[in-house]
Amino acid sequence: MSILIDTLLDRVKKEFDKPPIQWENITPSKKDMNFLRQECNTESEFDKANKRKVMFDELIRGNLVMVTCKCNYGQVVAVFETMEQMAELPWDLWGRILRMFYEKRNKTLFKVFFLANKSLRVFPKGLKPIQTENINGGYTYRCNPETIVIYRAEDATRVLIHELQHSCCLDNIAHSLDVVEAETEAWAELFYIAILSQGNTRIFNNLLQKQSEWMIKQNRKVKKHMTNSESTEFPWRYTVGKEKIWNEWGILNKSITPGDNVVRSLRLTYPPNNTLKERFKVIKESTIL
């Protein structure tokens, strides 16, 4: 795995040696608006509270802000609750992520439909089972780069990476859905800390330690909400399952410090500090990074 990590960091470093991504404001097409309307008005097992519909309805009433931007690798149709929230999105970083997944031979640009709902990922009260509304925040249609839907602001950068893998046909369909999701999430979180490190080994190792500790402490709590902590019941695929894979890869840092920094959070990545937020040009209130 060390060879793969070295390769990943080298790839990320080369990405940040390239010029910044140039975004331009555009008007969303009728096709894109119809897709967004259809998705927001369709029930989904991942969004049982239908946060998508609530936000779309508020958008139509004129109470929310829509921004559509395009670069050479894709476009983002973003719906924000406030104008100030626009400064929470790391535009250059998202563009670089799209560029790293983009395949020239395919020539299909990514389309990301981002509904920046501010609701946070939190554990349910007591020891109630964890449901999709506690933890999920996006989906896509497999092998379709034009259908990435993210409907929660918190941890949206990690969700973008997760869904890009599905959209690029990287799923091992020989595996069960739970295992595919666990593998995808394991890779998403590894890629996330790699790109935040900008390919710097020292920063990467520090983030790897923080992410490992966050994962382990969070999953100790997750198991208490499961009927059988050794099973693959929900949300094993996003939590215990991905930790198992990191452990198998030999990258899980098991050095745990005292204290509970997770508290009630079900955000899957360790929250970035203000230094990282400044580096990626987002305001300190940003949960999107």
Feature-to-residue mapping (PLM):
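Short Lys/Arg-enriched alpha/beta "domain-start" segment
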Residues: S2-L59, L64
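Short, polar loop/linker segments at the starts of domains and inter-domain junctions
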Residues: P19-S29, L89, K128, S229-P235
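Auxiliary, metal-adjacent structural segments of Zn-dependent hydrolase domains
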Residues: N41-E146, I150-E154, Q198-G199
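Intrinsic disorder
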Residues: E88, D155, D178-A182
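Amphipathic alpha-helical segments that form well-ordered structural scaffolds
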Residues: L93-M100, W187-A194, E248-I251
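Active-site recognition of the HExxH zinc-binding catalytic motif
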Residues: R158-D171, A188
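Post-HExxH zinc-binding segment in Zn-dependent metallohydrolases
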Residues: N172-V222
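Pan-zinc metallopeptidase signature
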Residues: E213-L289
